[in-house]
Amino acid sequence: MTVAALNKLSALSGSIQKSFSPKLISVGIIGSGNWGTAIAKICGENAKAHPDIFHPQVHMWMYEEKIQHEGKECNLTEVFNTTHENVKYLKGIKCPSNVFANPDIRDVGSRSDILVWVLPHQFVVRICNQLKGCLKKDAVAISCIKGVSVTKDRVRLFSDIIEENTGMYCGVLSGANIASEVAQEKFCETTIGYLPNSSVNPRYTPKTIQALFNRPYFRVNIVEDVPGVALGGALKNIVAVAAGIIDGLELGDNTKSAVMRIGLLEMQKFGRMFFDCKPLTMSEESCGIADLITTCLGGRNHKCAVAFVKTGKPMHVVEQELLDGQKLQGAATAKEVYEFLDNQNKVSEFPLFTAVYRIVYEGLPPNKLLEAI
């Protein structure tokens, strides 16, 4: 669907273009997978709920692809804009009629005062480059991308990478938020790390950000600890692998709870040591303890770790069989974090993180996990 056709379609939706006020804040979404679509649904609902704050249209960048729909080949954007449903990535969930799928990423960027990033982390730099020269000077961003970029020399938040490559201030949203459950409006909480007075535009306050995301089923808490929010979503995956190892060994819930507690302490220590994070962010907020519990009770990291122990197969084989070759976040993060800690001479201070790495990559027997921690 062309941008011209999209504009024509959106103009027909209540003639909302005619009532546009420059004072209203325009919201754009970068990404349209299951989580991106769920976030777009929330933003669309809140754009309608707060007509005094937000422009009624929410444009979601959707990578154009052909799909089979009702017996014929169609563009995914056309199907979405006709049915208000992402039939490929979030089937069965209706989005508000004011959310539009837009295949032109620069058009989405140029429209947006608040740009919400919800896409796989490996595409962040590429998308930043595609958006150069089209963004509003006072626009801000919110990253819903879980994980961190780790090398031997440094740990970088994806919010920092977005800031460095676009010039936009970037906050972080993270929590115990399974996309399908959020889309089904099952109650959950989330945490947004966002600094007050961070934007050159005084309109983009923490209260504005909260108004954009808070729903009766999606409770938002704003904190000033941006790195703490981001790190919780990354490091909990390592702990989830450890929890899966415990379940694979059938050592029981008491043991798993102990491993989760030790893992949380290492998450807090890592945040304090390298980012000056606030300890309470991980022990009290959804981005920390709640996300850790959810991930350790289920999910891909836990599932693959259980299979790794029970089958004795290498993790890359388990990934191939259970994830169709996708890389397991917890295992990959464990390797990256270990190499970083080794370079910092801090390996001994993080025994659980180190044990997960050595079990997955160096052949340490899984039953040695408890001895190691």
Swiss-Prot record:
Enzyme class label: oxidoreductase
Pfam families named among the record's database cross-references: NAD_Gly3P_dh_C, NAD_Gly3P_dh_N
Catalytic activity: sn-glycerol 3-phosphate + NAD(+) = dihydroxyacetone phosphate + NADH + H(+)
Biological processes annotated in GO: glycerol biosynthetic process; glycerol-3-phosphate catabolic process; glycerol-3-phosphate metabolic process
Localization, UniProt: Cytoplasm
Sites where the protein binds substrate: K146, R300, N301
The entry's keywords: Cytoplasm, NAD, Oxidoreductase, Phosphoprotein
Any one GO MF annotation of this record: glycerol-3-phosphate dehydrogenase (NAD+) activity
Modified residues (Phosphoserine): S15
Residues holding NAD(+): G31, S32, G33, N34, W35, G36, F123, K146, A179, R300, Q329
Catalytic site: K236
Cellular component GO terms held in the UniProt record: cytoplasm; cytosol; nucleus
EC number: 1.1.1.8
Family: Belongs to the NAD-dependent glycerol-3-phosphate dehydrogenase family.
Name of this protein: Glycerol-3-phosphate dehydrogenase [NAD(+)] 2
Organism per entry: Schizosaccharomyces pombe (strain 972 / ATCC 24843) (Fission yeast)
Underlying gene: gpd2
